[in-house]
Amino acid sequence: MIARIILTLVLLALLGPADAQQFGPAQFAIKDDDGDPMSNHSLSADQMAQVAGLPGLVDVGGPKGDVTLYQFYDLNCPFCKEAAADVDALIRGDRTLRLVFVPYPVLSAQSIEAARVELALRELSTPQKFLEFHRKIYGGRGLIDGNRALAVAQMLGFDRKKIIETANTKRVTDTMTTHAKIGSALKLVATPAYVVQGAAILGHPGLEPLRTLVASVRKCKAVVC
């Protein structure tokens, strides 16, 4: 498999212990599908530009959509797995939404291994093929590490050697480091985290609240009208 994990401890140290969904003070009146307030805070125009300029982004919705929603996720976050089905339904039902995946491996060394494979696939395939991988790997159970991610990629027809070579490049390491640094700077201390229209939402609110957020951005250019 992947012979070595470069900067694993550095990546984890950048964020410290990360939680797989965490709640705290809310700046905007955003609620989850149970009616409970979601932890969130505002982001400046400069911070939004930092997110938009990240390397290694994967557009899986409409690339020219009228609303852009970023999802920062860790493949081993249980709430991210739960969110995957909702996010899939969201883009299937909204062809003008630009959904952007941001691999954000902050929970473990195994998450970093798997993210290396993901970022290699991003370079070697299309966004739709990446989405197919995303669906497939979340369809299984148990810990997702580099070996499991590689096995799923091979099932989808990717060349093992090319994946490993790409996954271990400095380019991929730099991408993960940048994601970790920006995520930490933006206080994305829970996974999944969503960034949209000047707001960061920590945790997964559910499908209908996400639809409401997107509708609000379309209507009044804000997450809450």
Locate each region found by the language model:
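Bacterial N-terminal signal peptides
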Residues: I5-G16
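C-terminal cap of thioredoxin/glutaredoxin-like
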Residues: I2, D19-I30, A151-C225
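A short, structure-level motif marking secondary-structure boundaries and short turns
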Residues: S44-A45, F72-Y73, F133-R135, I164-T166
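Extracytoplasmic/secreted envelope proteins and their assembly/folding machinery
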Residues: A84-D88, A114-E118, F130-H134, G146, ...
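Structural microenvironment flanking redox-active thiols in thiol-disulfide oxidoreductases
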Residues: G93-R122, P127-A153
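Extracytoplasmic thiol/disulfide redox context detector
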Residues: P17-Q110, D174-A185, A190, K219-C225
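Soluble non-cytosolic domains of exported or imported proteins
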Residues: V67, P78-K81, S108-I112, L124-Q128, ...
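Active-site-proximal beta-strand/loop segments in catalytic clefts of secreted hydrolases
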Residues: F72-D74, V102-P105, I137-Y138, Q197, ...
